[in-house]
Amino acid sequence: MYIRRLNDQTANQIAAGEVVERPASVVKELIENSIDAHASCIRVDILQGGAKQIRIQDDGDGIHPEDLVLALERHATSKIAKIDDLQDITTLGFRGEALASISAVSRLTLTSRQKNAEMGYRISNISHKIMTPVPAAHPQGTTIDVQDLFYNTPARRKFLRSPATEFQHIRRIIERLALSHFTTEFLLHHNEKEIIHFKSATTISGQENRIKSILGDVFMQSALAIEFSQSGLTLKGYIAEAAYTRSQPDLQYIYVNGRFVRDKLVAQALRQAYHDVLFHGRHPAYVLYLEIDPAFVDINVHPTKHEVRFRDPQWVRDFLIHAVKTALAQAKPGIVHPLPQSTAEYNPITNFAPTPLIEGQGNLSLIQEQPAPYTQTIVHKHPLGHALAQLQGIYILSQNEKGLVIVDMHAAHERILYEKMKKQLAEVGLAMQSLLVPINLSLNPQEITAWQTNKALFARLGFEIESFGPDKIVVRRHPSLLKPKNLENLIRDVLADLITHNTTSRVGERINAALATLACHAALRAPHYLTIEEMEALLREMEKTEHGGLCNHGRPTWKQFDIAELDTFFLRGQ
């Protein structure tokens, strides 16, 4: 077959497939243009899930009449002029492809008027021909009317889902944009019915109300405010306490310089931060804003601009893990408060806090200090209140200023022991154990290089490894908490992490898992009856223990029952 050049119409329709996947893609691109044009109010009207009509009106800067034709051409943009401009890009759009791609697969009309202009102008794309702009009455700003999406590409149109499904995708797009542009007012109508109206939010309370309307009341009730800066990176936003988790990762919003992204590195880093407190199979919830020098992040990875590439991904990963871990650690049982900015130094390699028991360490006792004699102290001084009694040797009943607190004795003691063991390990170091039969491993060239580069890291992780020829190593000692039968796979997995990501957390996770198991077995088990003084000591330990609201497996350690809840149940005051 001969090579032939595609005509412009075919080439544009093929290229449009990268930008316009469904009606929601159109809404995203056009709203981003409105935001870049400094619009303070954006209205979106949808008919039949966007397949029939998408109409977006804004009060932004508008487009000069002489630029209207150029606006519908591919690779025409006002955002950048040369490749170097991408190093300092601050706008959401910059590729100059959106309008051209949309007009290639729809019937598009654009009307715009600039501030102080006597009239607006309208331009249409009919049968793939851009018409001459004509005068048209229009307020300041721009209106883009997109009708019959994919009318000329039947193969694409038949893959559209139901109008209800397509509309839900549109709604999610608007919610994502609304979460990063609080001062902009958003209105969404579907089939002439108002669905969303986010008013401009210029105060913290207004922004929190917008977040609550999107992520829900329960999220905000469990949310921790975070503001953390270090080494040129800043992370702001809200993370849910570890006790609030989801069965799906549907409440995870991460923005890089105001742009919503789906980035595996970022998602994995945030999940790693929750690793020590997350119940198996559950997902954390958060809305976070990462600010970074534009020169250190490449947003020109994919036409949809959902993906980014960091110049130093390890730097970003370590920062995110440390910031979120610090925030979660400062959340104490019974206390809800915003978290102050932290600038503490940290070691990104050792910050995973490997935590086995020291060699010869026995079970830690429940009460480390003699408690003060129990008195009727003012309740609010202690968030978990004061012990009243114990139920069947399992649950501790406590009273605080809100009402009744029920504590799972085993789960609470388990977390207390676990955190104390981790702290003790960090202070004293790892216990190592010699192998009866050293393990010989044959490595490929990449693995050999990774091991030679990270010998010191393996030593810190509790391994004694030596070279055994040009392509082999021999493992002689290992962390005492790890079983020898799994060491070969673990070391290979660690080397794979180092090759791919230049970092690893596998050993720390394995050690922490072993330590969590030890803490679980060492903790008080039901039925075990405590004195009031012992219950008091347990409550005070919980209040000062990191992640004291969750056991080592991510289950809650306590539950608050407010007086109002009890009054409602018993029909008091009715």
Curated annotation (Swiss-Prot):
PROSITE patterns registered for this protein in UniProt: DNA_MISMATCH_REPAIR_1 (PS00058)
Which keywords appear in this protein's UniProt record, sorted alphabetically? DNA damage, DNA repair
Keyword DNA repair in the entry? The reply is yes
The record's section on InterPro entries has:
DNA_mismatch_repair_CS, DNA_mismatch_repair_MutL, DNA_mismatch_S5_2-like, HATPase_C_sf, MutL/Mlh/PMS, MutL/Mlh/Pms-like, MutL_C, MutL_C_dimsub
Which regions span the lipid bilayer? Answer: none
Using the record for this protein, list the coiled-coil segments as residue ranges, or answer none.
Answer: none
Give one GO molecular function term: ATP hydrolysis activity
- Answer whether the UniProt record assigns the keyword DNA damage to this protein: yes
What CDD domains is this protein classified in? HATPase_MutL-MLH-PMS-like (cd16926), MutL_Trans_MutL (cd03482)
Q: Name one GO cellular component term.
A: mismatch repair complex
GO BP annotations, alphabetical order: mismatch repair
- Report the domain of life of the source organism: Bacteria
Q: Provide the family line.
A: Belongs to the DNA mismatch repair MutL/HexB family.
| Function per UniProt | This protein is involved in the repair of mismatches in DNA. It is required for dam-dependent methyl-directed DNA mismatch repair. May act as a 'molecular matchmaker', a protein that promotes the formation of a stable complex between two or more DNA-binding proteins in an ATP-dependent manner without itself being part of a final effector complex.
Write the protein's name. DNA mismatch repair protein MutL
